[in-house]
UniProtKB/Swiss-Prot annotation:
Subcellular location: Plastid, Amyloplast
Protein name as it appears in the record: Tuliposide A-converting enzyme b3, amyloplastic
Family annotation (SUPFAM superfamilies): alpha/beta-Hydrolases
GO CC aspect terms: amyloplast
Originating organism: Tulipa gesneriana
């Protein structure tokens, strides 16, 4: 893999968990961008929680706290994701940096719905040496707890560039609207729209020439990490039968009202608050959107794909939920092929910031093999 395939250097320092368990051991990279937006007046007034304790203190950061960012001004602190102030401002602490699409590596951005602003970023591998046959298409949904990240985030752009080069697939990454400005189900609807936009190229005139010329629309796969894994499950239940060849759920963001043994009380409460912030009208952590195993949730037997793989990480807060999902899928009567990949000694979405470690290399190899059907 040549470094020339990247639009800029891979991130040197990730903003994540050293041990994968929630927010413990957080550090901030020097190039972090703080994004503050002013939402509609009604956007955050339903929040009734006090300031969340245990805020993360920036380490090795060039940023100084805002003079207005006093504790008394804060409505809800969901560090390291975002802070909501009493005047309605929303400050995102990570996942706001955008790497532009690079023609040199065959990437480009396309707006698919001007009304909502939903767009996709396409990755076309090895343009000069493309084979005469068309390429399978992977529709990808990024993570970020539904409140941060985008298709231009450095970690996602670099990872998907590498994945496209290694797998030889044409990748379509969906840039969906974020909560709380756009409460769930907006993100789910946007991802479904992105998927349907790709599928639409198989019938009639195709609006996107890359998909028309190079995409094999008889071989569509979908994947997502964390919140994107949650969306992947959502799309699998709603796609037309026979359209999706395979699905890869990476460290899926599945929750539930019962705290599991591997989950600390602090992390459990944090993610409950994050979910309620994103989904004001939710039924709670047993909402079928976030808990596919909740009573009344659609049967996993209804997943619309031929094969599926679930990746879990030993030190991830979500590891047991991922394993439970896999076990339930196998027992559901679903007629496809299921695989579980359990990786030890690593935490949540470790592969987005470490491309050269042994476990990351192994994960990439397993992902590529799955996407290729090997």
């Amino acid at each position: 893999m040549s470094a020339a395939l990247f639009c800029g250097p891979p991130p040197a320092v990730s903003f994540g968990c050293k041990d994968g368990r929630g927010r413990k051991g957080m550090v901030r990279s020097k190039d972090i961008v703080r994004q503050t937006v002013k939402p509609p007046a009604h956007a955050c007034r339903l929040i009734g929680w006090n300031k969340y304790p245990g805020s993360v203190v920036p380490t090795n950061s060039s940023l100084s706290p805002s003079p207005t960012a006093l504790d008394d001004d804060i409505e809800l602190d969901l560090s390291p994701f975002l802070i909501i102030y009493k005047d309605g401002r929303i400050e995102r602490l990570k996942g706001t940096t955008v790497i532009p699409a690079c023609p040199e590596v065959a990437t480009k951005d396309v707006i698919i719905d001007p009304a909502t602003g939903v767009s996709v970023r396409l990755y076309l591998p090895n343009v000069v040496d493309l084979p005469s046959k068309k390429l399978p298409v992977l529709v990808y949904f990024h993570g970020g707890g539904f409140v941060i990240e985008n298709t231009g985030s450095p970690n996602y752009h670099n990872y998907l560039t590498l994945l496209a080069a290694k797998s030889g697939l044409l990748i379509v990454s969906v840039n969906y609207r974020l909560a709380p400005e756009h409460p769930i189900p907006a993100s789910f609807d946007d991802c479904m729209a992105g998927f349907n936009w790709v599928v639409s190229h198989s019938a009639g005139p195709a609006p996107e020439p890359w998909l028309a010329r190079h995409g094999d629309l008889t071989q569509i796969l979908i994947s997502g990490d964390s919140a994107g894994g949650t969306v992947t499950h959502y799309v699998l239940l709603r796609a037309d039968a026979g359209v999706i060849e395979g699905a890869a759920l990476v460290h899926p963001y599945f929750l539930g009202s019962k705290r599991l043994e591997n989950q600390t009380e602090e992390d459990f409460e944090f993610h409950e608050k994050l979910w309620r912030l994103s989904t004001p009208n939710t039924e709670g952590l047993d909402d079928p959107l976030i808990n596919p195993l909740a009573p009344g949730a659609p049967s996993l037997a209804g997943l619309k794909c031929k094969r599926a793989v679930v990746f879990v990480a030993e030190l991830d807060f979500l590891v047991e939920r991922g394993r439970m999902y896999y076990d339930a899928l196998v027992k559901s009567g679903w007629g496809g092929e299921a695989e579980l990949v359990h990786q030890e000694g690593v935490g949540h979405v470790f592969h987005l910031s470490d491309y050269s470690g042994d476990v990351s290399v192994d994960m990439m190899a397993k992902m590529v093999a799955f996407l290729r059907g090997e």
